[in-house]
Structures are given as C-alpha cells and as structure tokens.
Amino acid sequence: MSKRYARFLTAVFCLFLGGLMVWQMLLPDRERSDVENRTLQQRPALTLSSVLDGSYMEDVEAYVQDQFPLRDQWTGLKARTEQLIGKRLFNNIYLCEGETLISKVDAPADGLEKANLNYVSQLAEKSDIPMYLGLIPSAAEVWRDKLPVGAESWDQNAYLSQAAGLGLPMIDFSAALTAHADEPIFYRTDHHWTSLGAFYGANALLEVLGRESLKQESFTPEIASTSFNGTLYSQSGIHWLTPDTMEFWVKEDGLMVTSWRTGSPEPGILYDRSYLTEKDKYASFLGGNQPLCVIQNENARDGGKLLLIRDSYSDALAPFLAQSFAEVHLLDPRYYRMPPAQYAAENGIDAICVVYSIPNFITDRNLVFLAQ
C-alpha cells in the first residue's frame, strides 16, 4: 500500500468520524429507544465533583453510546453480522429455530434461589389458609429442543424437584406446558407465555385446587395485535424477526377490576388497549405492573377468593382464573408491602398461590417480605 493511498484512507476515516460527531451534535437527544425498550443516557452535567470522582467521563461515554446517530440501525446490523459468522447467543439470548428468541437462564450464584424457597415456607407456616406453590419453567426448559446445538441453560426441572421438597402442594405448570410444547405457548420475541400458554397454566392451577378445568372451546380469541416485539427482541439486537401475534381470550363483560397503583383503589381494566399502540404491548394485560389488583366476577362458576403472590406472568393468567373464582387478588411483592399473611386474613382469602416464572423467582429480592 502506497503512502499516498494510506493517507487517503486515513483522511476518509477521519472525515467519517468527524461527520458522525457533527451529526450527533446537531441531532436532538432521544429520551428513550422504543427498539431497545429503555431510557437513554442524557447529556451529563459538568461539575467539579463528577470530574474528580470520574463519574463524568463514565456518563459521557454512556451518553455518546446511547445518542450515537442511527443507534438502533447499528445495533441491528451488528447482530446480523454476528449471526452470519455463526454466533447464536446475543446478550444472553439464543437465536433459535423458527424465528424464536429464548433467554438463557444462568445458574444462581448468590443462594437467593434457596432463600426464596425458605421465605415461601415461612409464609405457609404463618397462615392457616391453604397455600400452593407454582413455578413456571421458561422457554429455555420447555423448548430446550429448540436451542442451538450445545447451548447451555440452567436445569430448571432440577430446581422444581428441590421446590417440591418444601412439602407444599405444587402447581404442575411444567407438565401442563410440556404436554403442549409443540404449540405457541410462549412468545417468540418475549419471555412471557402467550394467552394459550396462560390458559394451560390456569387449568394446571385449577386442577390442584380441585376445581373443574376450563374448556378451550368456551373462548373466542380476539387478535389484539400482530406487531408485538417483546423484551427479547429489544435486548438481543435481533430486529429482523416476524413480530408476534397477541390475543385476548377472556371477555370483559361481567368483570370488575380494581387497581391500587398509588395506594388507593381506582377503577382498573382487564385489557388496557392504549398499550397496543406502544412498544410494551404485554402491559395491555391489566395495565401492566402494579402493587395490587383485584378482579371480581359475580357470575364466577365456583366462587371463592384466590390470592396470587405473583410476577407479570399472572397478568395473562388471572383473567382465566376469574372464570372460576369470585375474586382474584394479585399482589406483587416488588411494590406491595403489607405482609401477605395479614392481607389474606383481612380479605377473607380461601387459597394462596405463589406463582412465579422460575427465572424471576430465583432472582427476586423482594420475596423476603413473604416472611413478614
């Protein structure tokens, strides 16, 4: 390579970088990335303390990365390039057959998975109300055959055996989902189960409580969206897959929803359709995360009051359970601080079910409040 040509390439590269810098300076800062589903770093304030402790330069680096021109397109191009050279794991998410993204489950390292089982056991000791434990295996276990050859993911079935050692009645979500593993029971671009998966999960719960199962032919699914790109889509950088279809199965007629989002009861909604025009479409189920929510059904088939101590999987599960129970109470320990045993006693609860996806259960530090 001649010196003249080398200088030419250097000049072109410098012009390219300079152009990007000018472009970035001229562009208005974005507050969030809908593709990545997260808030972006804003321009940091220059202060003496931030310079001295080094945080200013760290914030500047994060700011430049987040506000880089065409960031969403670059991250997608990076993932596509890595796929072409044989990579199958993107930000701890596997690209699997059938345009499916599956989150790898890492082995717990801090003992929280054992501690959380202990907190559940302590709650059972504090309450005289019948209590059940339901841990939902993720797609990495149920769809293990879809993972790339040699792909690793923590053994969730072994953990279910460990959980059974508590002696509590177990809701066998694993058997219910595995029996229908050839069906779309999980979203391809999100970690949650679909309405179909939640339907099978509801019947697993009703079975262990000795209640009649729901009939699939009793529901007429409504296609709520054909453009759902979930959290795995956002986190992986794999932005070329066909979007998921989201369905609503349960009719809203006859159901009354009450939410406690700010500490006081307010009218809720079974399906908040405003989210269907946004990135986080799964939040349309019950309106997303909230400390406490109660679904009432005067025409429930069997009656009774059920308390779900739960994560977001129950947002899609609860509408089905409301077909059997007169009241379904959903308590999220991340946001609600009344001791669950006290809440159950004060509200005339007939049965308590701790329902979590396994990846959430083994990492949630808020389950300590179950032992209060």
Please annotate each region the language model reported.
Residues 1-372:
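Extracellular glycan-modifying ectodomains
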